[in-house]
Design a protein with these regions (language model features):
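Hydrophobic alpha-helical segments
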Residues: 1-29, 604-636
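Extracellular/lumenal glycan-associated context and N-glycosylation machinery
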Residues: 26-606
Length: 636
C-alpha cells in the first residue's frame, strides 16, 4: 500500500512535469506503462460539499546522515500549480556549500549556480574556464584546464611528459584532420620500432607508401628473412585488396634490410620501405557495394538505388590519409592526418542506407524516423549552400616541475559562414536554438570554487520537445496522448532551487499550468481510476511522522452513507470513515499564493513578475516529483 501511495503521488506530481512522457517514449499501446492510482487510505473524511479527503499517516525514520526539518509539497489541479519544499539537517557538517537555481519557460531553459568544496591535498594549482556561444551570427566554444598535482600523488612516476595536438576541419566538400600524441613513461625497456603508412589518390588510382622498422618473431621469420620473401609477403598482404575489388596492384620494394634482433624476444629486425599502386578498384568497390545492398534482406533498396549509393561512395577523393607510430626506450609518438574531398556524397549514401533498414517482423519505426533523415539531408544542403566550415581543436600536455606534475588541456570550436548557414536552415523551416554557457572554477585557498550559467532559447521550446515525443510514439498510444494533453494544458513555468550550507540541504521546486485539468483528465482515463485527487498536500515537520492528504472533489453527496464512501476505490476495509458532521478536524490546503510567488508569476494574469531573466536549467519541475517521492519514500 505504501509503495502504491508513493507511486500515485509521484505520478500526480509528474502531471506537472514538462517531460512526463519522455521516459516511455518508445512504449507501444499494448506494452505501455502501468499508470498508478490512489492506494487504500488510512482514513477518509467526507466534507459538507461531498468532497472526500483521504488521509495517509505513517511513522518515519530519520534519513541516513541527517534529520528532516521540513518536508511539504502540494498540487492543486484547479489552480494549475505544484510546489514542494524539503529541508534536511545533516548530522555531520559538510564543508561543501553551493546554490543552484533552475527555471524552464515555454521558450527558454536556463541555469546558474555556484559551488565551493574542499580541495584535494594533492592539488597545488587549478583553473578551469569554459565558454560556449551559439547565436544568430556566431557559434564557438573554448575550454581550458590547468592543474598542478603535487608529487605526493605519484603521477610523475608513470608519465614524465606528454603532448597532444589535434585539429579537425569540416567543410561542405572537404574534410581535413591532423593530430599527434607523444609521451614518455620513464621506462626504457622495449625495442625501438616505427611504422608509417600514407595513402594518396590521383586520376590513375591509389598509392600506398609504407615504411616499417620493427622486430620479427619466430612465427613469421620465413616471411621476411629474404628480399624475395618480403616482396611476396607484401604482395599477398597488400595486393589482395585489389584482387577482391577487380583491380590490379603493383608492388615496388624500395629498400630492404633484415638483421639480428636487438632483444632476446625477437628473431630479427626488419627495415623495409615499399610502394603499392592500385588501379581499377573504384569501379569494383562501387559494384560490390551495390550488389551487397541490393541483395541484402536487411536493407530495402532497389538495384538502381544501391548502384547510386555505390557510385557516391566511390566518388569520394582521398587526397591523403596517413598514420605513423614510433616507440622505444620509453618514448612513444603517434600521428595521423587526413585530407578528403567529395565526402558529402558518401555521407548522404550512408544515411540513405540507414533509412532503408528493414525492421524485424512485428516491429515498426516511429513516425518521425523518415522526418529525421529528411532533416539531415536539409542540414547537409544548408551546409553546401552556405559554405559553413567547422573547426575542432584539442591540445594538451603533461610536464614535470619541481613541485610535481603540471597538466594542461585546451579544446576549441570555431565556425565560418555561420550566419549564412542559419539563414539557409531557416529557409528550409529549421530553427536552431540560441545558447550560451559559461563556467569558471579555480583554487581559492584550501577550496575549489566554481560559478557557471547556461541558457538555451528557442521559440516553442517545450512544445517542440513534446512534439518530438508524440512523433516518436504510435498514434493514440498512452504516452502520445499524455504528451499531447501536456501541451494542451498550457505549461507556464517550472523552477527549482537547491542550496547546501551550514550543514543543511534545502530544495524547493514548483510548476504552473493554465489548465492542468486537461492533463489530469487524460491521466485519469489512462489509469482507469474512478477519480483522481484535485489537490494533494504532504507534510512532515519532524523526522518521525508524515501525513499526506488527497482530496477527491465531489466524490459523494454531502449526506453520503458509510457504504457510499466505502464504494470508492481508495477506501478499503481497514480505512476509518468519518461522515460529514461527525468529526472536528481541518485539513491543510495548497498555499497557492506562495507557489505563484515562488514562480514569479502573477496568479490572476499568469504573467511574469520577476525582475530580469530567471536562471534555470533542465526540466526543473521534475524535482517537484522527486521531492514528493523522497518525502514518501521514508514510509518504506
Amino acid at each position: 500500500v505504501r509503495s502504491r501511495l508513493l507511486a500515485v503521488v509521484f505520478a500526480a506530481l509528474l502531471i506537472a512535469t514538462p517531460m512526463a512522457g519522455v521516459a516511455g517514449a518508445q512504449e507501444s499501446q499494448e506494452d505501455g506503462p502501468e499508470w498508478p492510482t490512489p492506494p487504500e487510505a488510512d482514513s477518509a473524511y467526507v466534507t459538507d460539499d461531498g468532497d472526500v479527503v483521504l488521509v495517509y499517516e505513517q511513522e518515519t525514520e530519520s534519513p541516513t546522515g541527517g534529520t528532516v526539518e521540513t518536508a511539504n509539497f502540494g498540487l492543486d489541479v484547479g489552480e494549475g500549480v505544484a510546489h514542494a519544499l524539503f529541508v534536511q539537517n545533516m548530522t555531520s557538517a559538510s564543508e561543501t556549500t553551493g546554490e543552484f537555481t533552475t527555471v524552464l519557460d515555454p521558450d527558454r531553459i536556463a541555469a546558474n549556480g555556484s559551488l565551493a568544496t574542499p580541495s584535494p591535498d594533492a592539488l597545488s594549482s587549478f583553473s578551469l574556464n569554459a565558454d560556449l556561444v551559439q547565436s544568430d551570427t556566431e557559434a564557438n566554444a573554448d575550454f581550458s584546464l590547468e592543474a598542478g598535482i603535487d608529487e605526493s600523488a605519484g603521477v610523475g612516476g608513470f608519465v614524465e611528459s606528454a603532448d597532444l595536438e589535434n585539429e579537425l576541419r569540416v567543410g561542405p566538400d572537404r574534410l581535413t584532420a591532423d593530430g599527434q600524441l607523444s609521451f614518455s613513461t620513464g621506462f626504457g625497456a622495449g625495442t625501438e620500432q616505427s611504422q608509417s603508412f600514407t595513402v594518396t589518390e590521383d586520376d590513375s588510382g591509389y598509392t600506398l607508401d609504407a615504411a616499417q622498422n620493427r622486430p620479427v618473431y619466430s612465427y613469421s621469420v620465413d616471411n621476411w628473412n629474404t628480399r624475395s620473401a618480403a616482396e611476396q609477403t607484401i604482395t599477398q598482404n597488400y595486393g589482395s585488396l585489389a584482387t577482391q575489388l577487380g583491380g590490379e596492384a603493383s608492388v615496388t620494394l624500395e629498400s630492404y634490410s633484415f638483421s639480428n634482433a636487438t632483444d632476446s624476444y625477437a628473431d630479427g629486425m626488419l627495415d623495409v620501405e615499399f610502394t603499392v599502386e592500385y588501379t581499377g578498384i573504384d569501379d569494383g568497390l562501387s559494384e560490390q557495394v551495390a550488389t551487397m545492398l541490393a541483395s541484402s534482406e536487411q536493407y530495402d533498396l532497389t538495384q538502381s538505388e544501391a548502384e547510386t549509393v555505390g557510385e557516391q561512395i566511390a566518388e569520394m577523393q582521398i587526397n591523403e590519409a596517413s598514420v605513423s607510430t614510433s616507440t622505444g626506450d620509453g618514448a612513444n609518438e603517434y600521428s595521423y592526418s587526413a585530407d578528403v574531398e567529395n565526402y558529402d556524397g558518401a555521407l548522404r549514401a550512408y544515411y540513405t542506407v540507414l533509412q532503408s533498414a528493414s525492421m524485424p517482423a512485428g516491429t515498426s519505426l516511429p513516425a518521425s524516423y523518415n522526418a529525421s533523415f529528411e532533416r539531415i539531408q536539409q542540414t547537409l544542403d544548408a551546409q553546401q549552400e552556405s559554405g559553413m566550415v567547422q573547426t575542432f581543436t584539442l591540445d594538451g600536455s603533461v610536464s614535470q616541475a619541481d613541485s610535481g606534475t603540471d597538466v594542461t588541456l585546451n579544446a576549441g570550436y570555431e565556425t565560418e559562414n555561420w550566419e549564412a548557414y542559419r539563414q539557409a536552415l531557416a529557409d528550409r523551416g529549421i530553427d536552431l536554438a540560441t545558447s550560451e554557457m559559461t563556467l569558471q572554477a579555480g583554487l581559492d585557498g584550501d577550496e575549489i570554487t566554481a560559478d557557471g550559467s547556461v541558457t538555451v532559447q528557442q521559440d516553442e521550446l517545450v512544445s517542440n520537445m513534446l512534439r518530438s515525443v508524440t512523433s516518436t510514439t504510435e498514434n493514440g498510444s498512452d504516452v502520445s496522448r499524455l504528451a499531447q494533453a501536456f501541451e494542451d494544458a498550457g505549461f507556464q513555468r517550472a523552477r527549482t532551487d537547491i542550496s547546501v550550507s551550514d550543514g543543511q540541504v534545502q530544495m524547493e521546486a514548483g510548476a504552473s499550468f493554465r489548465n492542468m485539468q486537461q492533463l489530469a483528465s487524460v491521466y485519469q482515463e489512462l489509469s482507469g481510476a474512478e477519480s483522481l485527487p484535485s489537490t494533494i498536500v504532504g507534510e512532515q515537520n519532524s523526522s518521525d511522522s508524515s501525513t499526506v492528504y488527497m482530496r477527491l472533489s465531489g466524490a459523494v453527496s454531502a449526506d453520503a452513507t458509510e457504504e457510499d464512501v466505502r464504494a470508492l476505490e481508495p477506501v478499503g476495509e481497514d480505512t476509518e470513515v468519518s461522515l460529514a458532521g461527525e468529526y472536528d478536524r481541518t485539513f491543510p490546503s495548497v498555499d497557492v499564493e506562495n507557489a505563484y510567488d515562488y514562480l514569479n508569476i502573477d496568479r490572476s494574469t499568469g504573467t511574469d513578475t520577476s525582475e530580469g531573466s530567471q536562471p534555470g536549467f533542465g526540466v526543473a519541475v521534475a524535482l517537484v516529483a522527486l521531492a514528493g517521492a523522497a518525502f514518501l519514500a521514508r514510509r518504506e
